[in-house]
């Protein structure tokens, strides 16, 4: 009897999965990816940002990153620019949310003032890079609707789920995004971004994943290519440290001008 019940349960589960719609599967995959990264608390890292124009000329920026996990809301993040000298001291603070607009502030030392980034401007480029302001907030599940597309091989011999996500928040610069998520660890491998007209705008590729604190995966490099301008931005990450003791006081917009 017990074996028969187990077989029935397995059959019901299989039927449930098979009956799953493309939208339900896409949402489930996004939720699982989010759940696997929950509980990191906080982390700090160093980042090198390399900007390349169409001719291949480069400019390099050195940035320190701090991130705080927030229960029941999006993460808080702080970017502090150390180089080059002409932008040293620039800082960007982000409070990410679900469907509510992210709160973002930019401190510009040359002007000695903190500038709030308006919701309508989140699709603009961050500090001349190919990353938009909206790319830099934490990617809360609620920000998008999802649709599973297919399975296919992806980078480094991995197998990926491919899904489409459509921004559910106002003023996004994207009509949709197509995401490749690896089936081993639910890590993003590639994202294609489509502009408001539906044209292919950019591609972001993650590579060199490392595991930290026994379960948290972070990419060593993130390469964003703009197919419409020929420009690109490479982010190179290093010196990750988790659970360093950061708290809300380390993410205060009123202290941006005093940060070092």
Question: Where are the predicted features?
Answer:
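N-terminal signal peptide c-region/cleavage motif recognized by signal peptidases
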Residues: 14-16
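Long, terminal "pre-/pro-" and other extracytoplasmic accessory regions
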Residues: 19-20, 24, 142-158
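Preference for bulky hydrophobic residues occupying beta-strand positions
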Residues: 47-49, 65, 79, 146, ...
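Short amphipathic beta-strand and strand-loop transition segments with alternating hydrophobic
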Residues: 65-69, 147-154, 207-209
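Short, solvent-exposed mixed-charge patches
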Residues: 259-260
């Amino acid at each position: 009897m017990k074996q028969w019940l187990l077989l029935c349960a397995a059959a019901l589960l299989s039927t449930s999965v098979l009956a799953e719609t493309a939208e339900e599967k896409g949402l489930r995959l996004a939720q699982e990816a989010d759940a696997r990264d929950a509980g990191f608390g906080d982390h700090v890292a160093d980042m090198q940002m390399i900007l390349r124009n169409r001719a291949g000329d480069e400019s390099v920026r050195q940035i320190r990153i701090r991130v705080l996990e927030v229960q029941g809301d999006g993460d808080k993040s702080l970017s502090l620019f150390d180089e080059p000298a002409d932008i040293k001291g620039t800082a960007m603070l982000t409070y990410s949310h679900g469907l509510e607009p992210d709160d973002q502030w930019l401190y510009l030392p040359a002007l000695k003032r903190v500038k709030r980034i308006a919701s309508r401007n989140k699709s603009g480029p961050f500090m001349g890079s190919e990353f938009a302001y909206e790319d830099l907030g934490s990617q809360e599940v609620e920000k998008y609707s999802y649709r599973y597309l297919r399975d296919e091989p992806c980078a480094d011999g991995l197998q990926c789920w491919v899904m489409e996500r459509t921004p559910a928040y106002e003023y996004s610069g994207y009509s949709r995004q197509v995401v490749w998520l690896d089936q081993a660890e639910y890590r993003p491998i590639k994202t294609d971004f489509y502009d408001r007209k539906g044209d292919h705008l950019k591609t972001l590729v993650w590579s060199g994943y490392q595991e930290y604190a026994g379960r948290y995966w972070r990419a060593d490099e993130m390469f964003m290519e703009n197919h419409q301008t020929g420009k690109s931005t490479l982010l190179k990450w290093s010196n990750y440290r988790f659970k360093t003791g950061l708290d809300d006081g380390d993410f205060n917009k009123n202290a941006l001008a005093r940060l070092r």
